[in-house]
A protein has these predicted regions:
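Extended, low-polarity transmembrane helix blocks
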Residues: 1-32, 46-51, 55, 62-130
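Structural signature of hydrophobic alpha-helical transmembrane segments
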Residues: 38-48
Length: 130
């Protein structure tokens, strides 16, 4: 699939933007109920998780502090999986934990890759310093 090699940075950037945007929506939903979720009466762990979803997702989306934000998002989803989903079954398909597992692994990949130099605040600030 050599034809994808020339657009690899753009594909990675598009993935980063979309995944960050989708993740931030979970935080918005927790805090404000904007997508049908229940806002209010959150315990401390849900407040922390919602804050990481909202802020971390937004940072990943815009490409600012991408590696740190993606790592925090990955850890948050790993905690969500093991605290809330794992007790309902061994496999993600059994315990409705597929989304948490996929988010955790995609964010870990993005933490390893970083903003990747295109379509990010990090890349625009790096080029302005040169």
């Amino acid at each position: 699939m050599k034809f994808l090699d020339s657009v690899r940075p753009q594909i990675i950037a598009a993935t980063r933007i979309v995944v960050g945007f989708l993740f931030a929506q979970h935080g918005l939903d927790k805090f404000f109920g904007v997508f049908g979720g229940s806002s209010g009466d959150l315990d401390a762990i849900h407040i922390l998780g919602g804050a990481i979803e909202l802020v971390g997702g937004a940072l990943v989306c815009i490409g600012l502090q991408t590696r740190l934000a993606a790592f925090a998002c990955s850890g948050t989803m790993a905690v969500a999986y093991f605290l809330y989903h794992q007790s309902y079954g061994l496999l993600p398909i059994q315990n409705d934990g597929e989304l948490a597992a996929v988010y955790s692994w995609v964010f870990l990949l993005l933490a390893a890759i970083g903003a990747n130099g295109v379509w990010s605040i990090e890349s625009s600030s790096d080029s302005s310093r040169a």
